Amino acid sequence: MDLSPLVQRHYHDVLKHLYINPLEKCNLRCKICYTRKTNPILSEEEILAFISKYEHAEKLSIVTFCGGEVFTLPYFPRLVNTLTEKGIFVQVITNGTVDTLDKFSDPNSVNLIVSLDGLPDYHDANRGKGNFLKSSAFLKKAQSLGFHTEVFSIVTRQNYKDLDEFERYLANLLGYRISVTYHPRKPPAYLVHHPISNIVGQVDGFDFLTPQEMRELLRNKKTFPPKELGCYQIALASDGKVYGCCEGTVPLGVMTDEIGQLFSQLKKRLILWESANTLRNCLGCSQPDFVCGIKQYLT
């Protein structure tokens, strides 16, 4: 069995987009964070070596960095500058509280995806007092310097009803309508089955969405994971393991493996998904037994 034409096209597209998680450590202590703050941190040299090897196997257009908090890495601005000088577009998922923006040489080649979890009081209840102000100021400065900007927002039962108000608030605050991607708080089905990222955190005041709310969110808003899935890619983790997506549970291999071998393992996962898939217009998933804990909500 091979991939359907729809998934085959998407698979070839995602190979041009690499995800790297250099560290799990962070400068904040968010109450609903689900990741363990483990010690391994990829060096700048390790990252560049992996990217160089990757480029020998596939034309690389985009690299996305996430943590932890990558802006705490002393080498991070230099690393991004090296990549943008090579013509690679860089995306950075950040909490927006560590400002080294002046050290980036080509803002137009960088997209900053800043975490804002709702209106100021709610955001600060999770991420710490004063952090909404810091992150929104970071966004304003980034926009003024010429960076591309987006917002990434975790959704719980408490802020679910305020999403439209939140978008209007941001538009008034920033002076433009910014793209917002909503990320439902990791459901119990995710936390129970993920071997590492499984911290429940505080539930009081940050309740998990109900099944109905989850389905409505997937239907009505831009979400991650998207309702059509397809969010797989080669994803290098801080411990040197390589996964088939940023939330992977079973590695495809390790960073010293040949890139072609990693591609082959990813494709095998997608073929396995397609062999049992009943969803229409679905772009596939590299974790067919996991699906980030949202499989029951997909139709």
PLM segments and residue spans:
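Conserved alpha-helical substructure of the radical SAM core
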Residues: M1-K103, N108
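Flexible mid-to-C-terminal extensions adjoining Fe-S/redox cofactors in radical SAM and related proteins
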Residues: M1-K16, K241-T299
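Residue-level signal for mature regions of secreted extracellular proteins and peptides
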Residues: Y19, L23-C26, F224, S275-T278
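Radical SAM enzyme [4Fe-4S]-AdoMet core and its adjacent flexible, acidic
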Residues: N21, L42, K86-F89, N111-D117, ...
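Secreted/extracellular small peptides and ectodomain modules produced from precursors
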Residues: E24, K31, T64, L229, ...
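Short loop/turn motifs at secondary-structure junctions
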Residues: R29, K59, N108, F147-H148, ...
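Residues that line or immediately flank small-molecule/substrate-binding pockets and catalytic motifs
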Residues: K37, G67, L116, P184, ...
